[in-house]
Amino acid sequence: MVLSDFTGVGVGFGFGVGCGFGVGWGFGGMPMNILGVGAGGGCGVGLGLGWGFGTAFGSHYRSSRLTFQGIELETADKREEVVANMSKNST
């Protein structure tokens, strides 16, 4: 496990439903001394698609073995050692 920074891009998809209600009042200045009161409400549905980029800090597993497309590669010396051990065990 190694703690390190990650950087990359991403795509996001979102959906939301919301309702709101508000009440407000206001007072007009000179020369309009008028008091106003208002109320309102509304509902909405939203759908969105977005992209972004950023960094994060976390942990991930890192192996010291050399791999190519998921196949672990070993050195020739290591392979010869394994073959020699197999031949000793079979006799």
Swiss-Prot record:
UniProt topology in membrane: Multi-pass membrane protein
Domain of life: Eukaryota
Keyword match Methyltransferase: no
Keywords, in A-Z order: Chloroplast, Lipid transport, Membrane, Plastid, Transmembrane, Transmembrane helix, Transport
Chief site of localization: plastid
GO biological process: endoplasmic reticulum to chloroplast transport; ER to chloroplast lipid transport; guard cell development; plastid inner membrane organization; plastid outer membrane organization
Residue runs in coiled coils: none
Subcellular locations according to the entry: Plastid, Chloroplast membrane
Function: Facilitates lipid transfer from the outer to the inner plastid envelope by bridging TGD4 with the TGD1,2,3 transport complex. Required for endoplasmic reticulum-to-plastid lipid trafficking as part of the eukaryotic pathway of thylakoid lipid assembly.
Quaternary structure and partners: Interacts with TGD1, TGD2, TGD3 and TGD4.
Designated name of the protein: Protein TRIGALACTOSYLDIACYLGLYCEROL 5, chloroplastic
Phylogenetic classification of the source organism: Eukaryota, Viridiplantae, Streptophyta, Embryophyta, Tracheophyta
The encoding gene: TGD5
